[in-house]
Structures are given as structure tokens and as C-alpha cells.
Amino acid sequence: LECHNQQSSEPPTTTRCSGGETNCYKKRWRDHRGYRTERGCGCPTVKKGIELNCCTTDRCNN
């Protein structure tokens, strides 16, 4: 599986997920600088108030 791993509004980059990982994620939240976005492999548990999208196809988390 290949997932995007750039932060917020950086140019798109991808990473090849290891260990048979089947999910990509995109996490979004707001702080004093505005909206922040984090992308990567897996489907992490998030705290209340954080928007999380998990998906299972190559580069689905941009």
C-alpha cells in the first residue's frame, strides 16, 4: 500500500507502507495557526475533536 505522508499544505509526498498495513489515514485539527493536517500509514486512534479519515487504496488519503 502507498500512502501520502506530507503535512498540512506541503507538496504531496508518498511512502510505501510496511508490514502488510492496509490503511492510510488523514487527520485534521485546528490550532492557533489554523487547520493542521497529518497523513500516513495506518488508522490511529484520535482524541475528541480531531477529524480522522481512514481508507484502503493507494494514495487515497491526500
Swiss-Prot record:
Its main location: secreted. InterPro entries: Snake_3FTx (IPR003571), Snake_toxin-like_sf (IPR045860), Snake_toxin_con_site (IPR018354), Toxin_cobra-type (IPR054131). SUPFAM superfamilies: Snake toxin-like. GO terms for cellular component: extracellular region. Disulfide bonds join 3-24, 17-41, 43-54, 55-60. It holds the Pfam family Toxin_cobra-type. Residues 1-20 are annotated as: Disordered. It is found in: Secreted. Expressed by the venom gland. GO terms for molecular function: acetylcholine receptor inhibitor activity; ion channel regulator activity; toxin activity. It comes from the Eukaryota. Keywords: Acetylcholine receptor inhibiting toxin, Disulfide bond, Ion channel impairing toxin, Neurotoxin, Postsynaptic neurotoxin, Secreted, Toxin. Belongs to the three-finger toxin family. Short-chain subfamily. Type I alpha-neurotoxin sub-subfamily. Binds to muscle nicotinic acetylcholine receptor (nAChR) and inhibit acetylcholine from binding to the receptor, thereby impairing neuromuscular transmission. This is Short neurotoxin 1. It comes from Naja mossambica (Mozambique spitting cobra).
